[in-house]
Amino acid sequence: MTGCGMNSTNSGQPDEPGPGERSAEEVFTEFMDAMEDTVQHSGANWPNWDRQDTSGYFPPPCSVRTRDDGRAYQTQIEGGPVDDPQAAVDHMKAHWKSKGYTIGNIFDDVNPATGMQINARTPRGMLVQFSPTRNGSLIKVVGECTLDPAARKKTT
């Protein structure tokens, strides 16, 4: 999401790092954990996802203080179908709420496959999106923006 606005907050806690101040390692771990958590609670099969494979991520620019001064890890993965997209969205919504996520837009019938899409934000502003359909499913996560120069390198 080149040129996107700030997506990092500190939840108003005085002892937490402010926007962009967390290390690339911290935000990458949280990003990967959010992917894994969503995969585990999706009800779909994700044959191309491996939480242990951390190589090849090169985060595009994001903005913390000035345009494109940070980096945010992001990816989208494709998975198998779900029999009941509504039930899958309801389950994910309840799960995300239990984790303190803010539930955003929920779309139904977003494509010819009669699927759905649910969007949420973590307490630190990471975007998590789950789109289950009867033909296949998608998960997209856009991590927290970090100013750490280490995030400018492709993960290995």
Describe the residue ranges of each PLM region:
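Intrinsically disordered/low-complexity terminal segments and short unstructured peptides
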Residues: 1, 8, 85, 154-155
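N-terminal leader/targeting segments
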Residues: 2-68
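Active-site oxyanion-binding pockets that recognize sulfate/phosphate
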Residues: 21-24, 78, 82
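C-terminal basic regulatory modules in eukaryotic proteins
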Residues: 27-34, 142-156
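Extracellular/mature segments of secreted proteins
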Residues: 68-75, 152-155
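Extracytosolic low-complexity repeat regions of secreted or lipid-anchored proteins
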Residues: 80-144
